[in-house]
């Protein structure tokens, strides 16, 4: 109803649900069909936060566990930030985008995001890793119910040998546990099965392959979501949209 009031001709949703028959059936019964374009990555790694902290560390790969402790040994500290750190966060995000070749939102987006998610009744937290007064890396996570999700990460060009991103993830997991979460979603890896991922992560660096190499070390399990689904609200306009996409050669969206 809200989508119709806004003049939308179709509603696209990406439910936070595992790719299973019951989820697909429920969506189909509600009038949705599978949409060929996913906005968010369908596959992710979810880390169990059950047990003691030493149990969580023990489930990590040896190198990842070592890097967490190395960062601590090298004097890296992690503090909570807020919207007052928006400019600092954006500078780290910009450095990461330039280094890794991807696009980011304008600075105002992150400023508003931090204000809404980390202030007042927000469900999120900003973590900043520093050493000797230098900002090295940052992470934004959110916690809802029993699950926390890693949303954004950024790092400076220097100081990467101190492994600040490993300690950031660990501190975010500790924060999530303190907020009653028993799982931590690392949010986004290539949409491939585990055998393919393990066979290719050392040689591939395109897309999400680079982050898979980092995320796999935290000892989580691969999970695939049900993906994007669409419900046309105005069939004439929906068919016109599909026809226009076909004419422009964007067949994936017109399927």
What do the PLM-derived regions correspond to, one by one?
Residues 7-15:
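Divalent metal-dependent hydrolysis catalytic cores, especially in the metallo-beta-lactamase
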Residues 8, 65, 76, 220-223:
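Generic structural signal for secondary-structure transition and capping sites
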Residues 30-54, 186-255:
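Active-site/acyl-donor-binding loops of N-acyltransferases
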Residues 87, 166-170, 209, 213:
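A structural signal for well-ordered alpha-helical segments within the folded catalytic domains
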Residues 15-162, 170, 174-178:
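A conserved beta-strand-loop-helix scaffold within acyl/acetyltransferase catalytic domains
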């Amino acid at each position: 109803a809200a989508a119709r009031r806004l003049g939308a001709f179709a509603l696209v949703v990406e439910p936070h649900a595992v790719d299973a028959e019951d989820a697909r059936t429920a969506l189909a019964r509600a009038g949705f069909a599978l949409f060929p374009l996913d906005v968010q990555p369908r596959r992710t790694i979810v880390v169990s936060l059950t047990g003691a902290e030493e149990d969580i560390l023990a489930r990590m790969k040896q190198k990842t566990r070592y890097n967490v402790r190395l960062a601590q040994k090298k004097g890296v500290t992690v503090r909570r930030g807020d919207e007052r750190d928006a400019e600092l966060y954006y500078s780290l995000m910009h450095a990461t985008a330039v280094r890794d070749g991807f696009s980011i939102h304008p600075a105002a987006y992150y400023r508003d995001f931090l204000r809404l998610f980390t202030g007042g009744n927000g469900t999120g937290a900003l973590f900043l890793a520093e050493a000797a007064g230098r900002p090295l890396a940052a992470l934004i996570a959110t916690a809802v119910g029993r699950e926390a999700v890693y949303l954004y990460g950024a790092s400076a060009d220097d100081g990467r040998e101190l492994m600040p991103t490993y300690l950031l993830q660990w501190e975010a997991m500790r924060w999530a546990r303190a907020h009653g979460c028993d799982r931590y979603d690392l949010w986004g890896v290539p949409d491939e099965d585990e055998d393919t991922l393990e066979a290719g992560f050392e040689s591939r660096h395109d897309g999400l392959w680079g982050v898979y190499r980092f995320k796999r070390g935290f000892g989580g399990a691969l999970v695939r979501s049900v993906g994007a689904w669409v419900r046309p609200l105005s069939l004439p306009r929906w068919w016109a949209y599909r026809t226009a996409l076909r004419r422009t050669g964007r067949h994936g969206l017109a399927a």
